Amino acid sequence: MLNHLKQHFGSRRTGGHGGLDIARHIGPGLLVTVGFIDPGNWASNMAAGSQFGYALLWIVTLSTIMLIVLQHNAAHLGIATGACLAEATTRFLPRIVGRAVLGSAYLATIATAMAEVLGGAIALQMLFGLPVRAGCVIVATVSMAMLMTNSYKHAERWIIAFVGVVGLSFLAELALVKVDWPQAAASWITPSMPTGSAAIIVSVLGAVVMPHNLFLHSEVIQSMHFEGQGEQVIEERLRYELFDTLFSMGVGWAINSAMVILAATTFFAHGMVADDLAVAAATLSPILGPASSTIFAVALLFAGLSSSVTAGMAAGTITAGMFDEEYDIHDRHSSIGVAACFVGAVTACLVVPNPFEGLIWSQALLSLQLPITVFVLIRLTSSPRVMGKYANSRPLNALLVGIGAIVTILDVVLLTGM
């Protein structure tokens, strides 16, 4: 990764590539950030912090590093080939294998959307007293309407604004608590596995590194338009993309860390376990004051809405890719994929008995599909037939395989610990 940084930012400089020019290209990575500050993350992070204090902050750091490498690789695929991960899967894998991979990814995306919609519904219940099931229908309807009636650029602006609201909300919450920063700093870089933490560790991993984001990032990045064509444009896009990914994933790491720290300093410190987001918000009031629970609920609502939109977009990307097409909300394959995803998500929300447990287990299920998507991505980006001169180097390939192995091992730990 350091070599990538030197190559993209230190080895040469072309005119007009200043800070403002780079800032104009920040956006695709923030769409991915939305996916790992979603309600599923809230449930996993609250469980991690309330049950184990600061001890599991290291998995947030590890997951974010893994995410940076994987998302950069997915974006690399989109830039070098002009095809997203779903399209490349259809083009370069045997038909039956490609359909199986994309089918499992689509089911994982429905599980993702369920978590996002359910989280938004829980926020509506906190704020207005609405029943969770009614809230699920409202959140899904609003999210689908945003996708069906807005271009990508308009949706991107809304989503970036939502990320800002969530980030500022957690800054406000942290200002209300006393954080043991030396202990937090040590926990960010010191792995530990307290007794009973295996399922939470894997759910945090599944909440940060998510398969649908790999499909979404590769689609969004390859759909951006740059002037000119050829290798020079590809190199330029790779420079911008790496900065965008590093910046955006850093924002996500900070917000996820803030969730764990908030839970550790409030619930764990008082001997309470946050096994329900609504109860967690209500419990904040007597500890931190009445404004804290409202801030918590507003941030959760914006997180649920924005991540529901990106989950729906990823679903449309996958179904379009099955037919070797780019995502286009006005295209039949994309729009059907979006609509079916939200219908499936709402149906799941209506039958799940416990919303909080539904959020936790949706993240664990995502982590079980993740190795499939990761190894398909590695297979494609390491192939000169697919990537040409931009195929993965051996060191990068080794790193990616190592990440895939870690994901798989953690999945085995989850299954054997159930």
Predicted regions span which residues?
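Hydrophobic alpha-helical segments and their helix-loop junctions in multi-pass secondary transporters
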Residues: V163-T190, L205-I221, V376-R385, L410-M418
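Juxtamembrane transmembrane-helix boundary signature
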Residues: V32, I59-R91, V101-A108
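Transmembrane alpha-helical segments of multi-pass small-molecule transport proteins
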Residues: L102-G103, L127-M148, V165-S169, D328-T347, ...
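Extracellular/periplasmic helix-exit of transmembrane alpha-helices
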Residues: L67-A80, I221-Q222, G230, G250-V279
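C-terminal membrane-solvent junction of multi-pass transporters and transport-like membrane proteins
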Residues: W158-A161, D331-I336, P355-L415
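Flexible loop linkers connecting adjacent transmembrane helices
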Residues: H4-G10, S44-G49, H72-V97, I122, ...
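Helix-loop-helix module between adjacent transmembrane segments
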Residues: M66-A74, I96-E116, A121-S151, G206-A207, ...
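Loop-to-transmembrane helix boundary motifs in multi-pass membrane proteins
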Residues: R95-G98, R133-C136, F247, A291-S293, ...
